[in-house]
Amino acid sequence: MYVSLFIGCAIVLDIYCYTLYGHLHVNVSFDGQWCQLKAYLFYVSGCGFFYSYLLQAIYRLCRITLFRKPSLQTFRLYVCGIVVQWLLSFVQVIPVLLLGTFEYLPHDYHCQIAIHNVRGLLIGLALVHTIPISLTTMCYAYTMFYIQKISATIKTARQLATDQRDFLVLKRIFIVLTTLIASGMPAFSIGLYFQFTGHLPYWSTQFQWLSATFAMLIVSIILIFVSPNVPKFRMYFAQ
């Protein structure tokens, strides 16, 4: 999760540097394979970020619903899961690249899915966001159903308390994903507005990146409180 977040932030910083340089040297162009590759890696990092939450959701699901199978909770298994997570991320974004969805924006000096390209936005949404978010939501829904309908009849009070803690973490993961989805809706709405009116505000791309940056900030803050080690740090510094 943190690796994908770091890669995404590094690419965003690189994009800002290119954009700033382009505004200072208006005749320059950065169109090319490297521009396309950076856009591809940015979406790979985003896909990997969502899959990291799916992996956490699967872990919590196994701890709660499959607690009698410790083999599904081993460290080695989830290391393999991380490898699979990144393989899926690289593979899923390849169609976005091959379909020519990434465009060079001459006024912004970088490549991305243009905000007026609703087809491209839908392809990116389907391949990058929908699959991991849908699976994570299914894990969340089934875990909630299990705790409410089944868990109380077969587990001890101590096990139920552990389940509640795991479910709380899973709930916070769902809140983070909801925040990320909500952050992308304004940009998507601008794309739909362009389809109906043929008018695209000049600040649309900047607004898209502003909403994405704001979402990263919110997620970073939420992650501080989601982390199970935060109470330990508080107790340590309170001493």
Locate predicted features.
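Intracellular effector-coupling site of seven-transmembrane GPCRs
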Residues: 3, 145-185
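Extracellular TM2-ECL1-early TM3 structural module of rhodopsin-like
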Residues: 3-55
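Hydrophobic alpha-helical segments of membrane proteins
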Residues: 10-14, 90-94, 134-138, 169-192, ...
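Membrane-water interface of transmembrane alpha-helices
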Residues: 53-58, 139-152
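Class A GPCR helix-loop hinge within the 7TM core
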Residues: 46-81
